[in-house]
């Protein structure tokens, strides 16, 4: 039997995000981009590497699947 991995949503806390773009530069699949003052995430392109979460200087990005292990 094959076990399928189900993606869960990522969240960007707009109260913490300072729109510095660090997460954009960290993403190896270009799944994150800055649209004026909104961080957007293309979840189908996301490979759940966690680089954006770890690279965010304000801790604004979270995901249910990320537990601090890279």
Swiss-Prot record:
[4Fe-4S] cluster 2 binds at residues 27, 46, 49, 52. Its cofactor is [4Fe-4S] cluster. Keywords: 4Fe-4S, Electron transport, Iron, Iron-sulfur, Metal-binding, Repeat, Transport. [4Fe-4S] cluster 1 binds at residues 17, 20, 23, 56. Residues 8-36, 37-66 form the 4Fe-4S ferredoxin-type domain. It comes from the Archaea. Binds 2 [4Fe-4S] clusters. GO terms for molecular function: 4 iron, 4 sulfur cluster binding; metal ion binding; oxidoreductase activity. Signal peptide: none annotated. PANTHER family: ADENYLYLSULFATE REDUCTASE, BETA SUBUNIT (PTHR43687), L-ASPARTATE SEMIALDEHYDE SULFURTRANSFERASE IRON-SULFUR SUBUNIT (PTHR43687:SF6). Ferredoxins are iron-sulfur proteins that transfer electrons in a wide variety of metabolic reactions. This is Probable ferredoxin TA0517. It comes from Thermoplasma acidophilum (strain ATCC 25905 / DSM 1728 / JCM 9062 / NBRC 15155 / AMRC-C165).
């Amino acid at each position: 039997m094959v076990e399928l991995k189900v993606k869960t949503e990522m969240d960007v806390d707009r109260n913490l995000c300072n729109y510095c773009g660090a997460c954009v530069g960290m993403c190896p699949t270009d799944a994150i981009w800055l649209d004026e003052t909104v961080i957007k995430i293309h979840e189908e392109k996301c490979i759940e590497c966690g680089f954006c979460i770890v690279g965010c200087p304000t801790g604004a990005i979270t995901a249910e699947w990320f537990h601090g292990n890279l």
